[in-house]
A protein has these predicted regions:
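N-terminal cationic and glycine-rich segments that engage phosphates or anionic surfaces
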Residues: 1-104, 109-445
Length: 445
């Protein structure tokens, strides 16, 4: 523990890392503050019905992603999900449409163009989602407006504020990515999830203590043990890698010999990280948009897709998670490009011919590790529904797996790795190691 505290002190000694940590804390604090700023014209005391509506089902998950901003009718009520939806569409277009395929191969300039299109599409989605949210608010809490304000007058400025709030969250996320620590978008989602954890934990403890005579305390201990096991399994999933050995040919430059060393290509078991589950969850929110307009006439199928504990919801969810895992892995890792880079640098995989055979070998290995990875991630994704079989409270069950847990684990590990890289670059031990200053690559004790 002493070494860990010393390492935290080392984080503060590095000026660049200190600034990044402070910027991250500042922007996340701004995001949390905005989650409590209610839309102008709304009477917060009249939102009980909207908050009760988000206490269960898929609406509760959407509210958790926004850190409670959805049920508070805040300026950040739509959260970051419109941007996630736009990203899904652009990822699909980058695979299916030649124009975007070419753009994706243009490197940094192409990435900036795709990012611009993603922002434009985000605005288009917000033009639809903001009025949809306000119509739902009107149905659930028609008397939520302050005295003297009509819904007709309220709709247009409120739509602009909601859209601007969501775009501001996107801006915060991008600034955190550029100037802070970790992936800003994922970090903002994680902050929203963590904000709901204390309340969910208290509700679960209270519920179990009330049933202490019927074994409630024992069940709570069992829940914590299961939660611990699931967290450990999730960490192994995120960190698991398959190393492919690469041998580099020896070459003589002057009187010095270079190359000849064996290195490894670390293919992650879950190369797509948390993106497939975020994308799948974003698509599962589509039934909400349908029901907002015709809640009474919604079909049984749509109603089941809104219940994150129903069989249909979880079957569709598993299929989407597996599909997005393969899809995102395919667009993230390019075996052909990896094989070409290896050949260009006089590298080869022992026993495999350079070029096409190497690309096929890497692709085969990727397919073999992606299948178990996608199945395991799908199992983790439906763990909240399985936790419901143990009568775990709806809010607390979300932390047993699924989107919430994987985002928490993935974002924390990603942020720690970035902090670790800053420490190692400046000759300190990593965050999870001893914390002593290194000199010339050797720890100084």
């Amino acid at each position: 523990m002493k070494k860990f505290i010393e390492t935290l002190k080392n984080c503060w000694k590095i000026e660049d890392l200190r600034q990044r940590l402070l910027i991250t804390l500042l922007f996340t604090a701004i995001y949390r503050f905005g989650s409590f700023v209610v839309l102008p014209g709304i009477n917060p005391s009249m939102l009980e019905k909207l908050q009760s509506q988000t206490s269960g089902g898929l609406m509760s998950l959407l509210d958790m992603f926004s850190g409670g901003a959805f049920s508070n009718a805040s300026i950040f009520a739509l959260g970051i999900m419109p941007y996630i939806s736009a990203s899904i569409v652009m990822q699909l277009l980058a695979v299916a449409v030649p124009y975007f395929q070419k753009m994706q191969r243009e490197g940094e300039s192409g990435r900036k163009k795709i990012q611009w299109y993603t922002r434009v599409l985000t605005v288009a989605i917000l033009v639809f989602q903001a009025p949809s949210y306000l119509l739902n608010l009107k149905m659930q809490a028609a008397n939520a407006l302050a005295t003297g304000i009509s819904w007709t007058v309220f709709m247009i400025p409120a739509t602009i504020i909601l859209a601007a709030g969501s775009m501001f969250i996107l801006w915060l996320g991008e600034r955190i990515t550029d100037k802070g620590v970790g992936n800003g978008i994922s970090l903002i989602i994680m902050i929203g999830i963590i904000a709901r954890l204390p309340q969910a934990f208290v509700q679960e403890v209270t519920s179990r203590l009330q049933a202490i005579s019927s074994g409630g305390l024992i069940m709570f201990i069992v829940e914590i043990l299961i939660l611990y096991a699931v967290v450990c399994a999730s960490i192994l999933l995120v960190q698991g890698t398959r190393k492919i050995p690469v041998q580099y040919a020896k070459r003589l430059v002057g009187n010095k010999q270079y190359g000849g060393a064996r290195q490894y290509i670390p293919l992650k078991l879950f190369a797509a990280n948390v993106m497939p589950i975020i994308f799948a969850q974003a698509l599962m929110f589509i039934p909400l948009a349908i029901v907002r307009y015709q809640s009474e006439n919604a079909s049984t199928v749509v109603q089941q897709l809104m219940d994150n504990r129903s069989l249909l919801y979880n079957v569709v969810y598993v299929i989407l998670v597996i599909a997005f895992t393969y899809f995102y892995t395919a667009i993230t890792l390019n075996p052909t490009q990896m094989a070409e880079d290896m050949k260009r640098n006089n590298g080869f995989i022992p026993g495999v011919k350079p070029g096409k055979d190497t690309a096929e070998y890497i692709d085969t290995v990727m397919s073999r590790i992606t299948l178990p990875g996608s199945l395991f991630i799908a199992f983790i994704a439906i763990m909240p529904a399985l936790a419901g079989l143990l009568d775990v409270q709806q809010a607390f069950s979300q932390f047993f797996g699924g989107t919430s847990l994987l985002i928490l684990v993935g974002v924390v590990i990603d942020s720690l790795q970035q902090i670790e890289s800053h420490l190692l670059m400046r000759h300190y031990d990593g965050l999870l190691n001893s914390g002593h200053t290194r000199q010339g690559g050797v720890a100084a004790y």
